[in-house]
Amino acid sequence: MPFSHTKIVGPAGRYGARYGMGLRRKVTAIEVKQRGKHRCPSCRSLVRLERIAFGIWRCPKCGFTFAGGAWTPQTIMGKALAPEELKEVEAQKAKWKEAVK
């Protein structure tokens, strides 16, 4: 079977004329985000993360497995909370370094 979609319709081209244009546009938007390159939270490399199951992602470079969003590795809410969590982690690292000294 030849390539199932074109540049214009993207991944939703496999549906042909079925389901309506609105739904096919939504599917295209979701799948382009899902299959795009994302940063691994462990090694910080920009790679195409593998979706293992619903909300479970794995980095092909370092093998790190983590929980994320259903269709994208990081949700909008997760991005909003990430800076706060980073501050906490940095504070814990600083305390640990002081305790070791």
Swiss-Prot record:
The record describes how the cofactor is bound as: Binds 1 zinc ion per subunit.
Provide the binding site for Zn(2+). Answer: C40, C43, C59, C62
BP term (GO), one = translation
Name the Gene Ontology molecular function terms of this record.
Answer: large ribosomal subunit rRNA binding; structural constituent of ribosome; zinc ion binding
| Keywords for this protein | Metal-binding, Ribonucleoprotein, Ribosomal protein, RNA-binding, rRNA-binding, Zinc, Zinc-finger
State any GO CC term: ribosome
Q: Where are the zinc fingers (C4-type)?
A: 40-62
Task: Report which superkingdom the organism of origin falls in.
Answer: Archaea
Cofactor(s) this protein cannot do without? Zn(2+)
| Family named by the database record | Belongs to the eukaryotic ribosomal protein eL43 family. Putative zinc-binding subfamily.
Please give the function described in this protein's UniProt entry. Answer: Binds to the 23S rRNA.
Subunit and interaction comment: Part of the 50S ribosomal subunit.
| Official protein name in the record | Large ribosomal subunit protein eL43
Q: Organism source for this protein?
A: Pyrobaculum aerophilum (strain ATCC 51768 / DSM 7523 / JCM 9630 / CIP 104966 / NBRC 100827 / IM2)
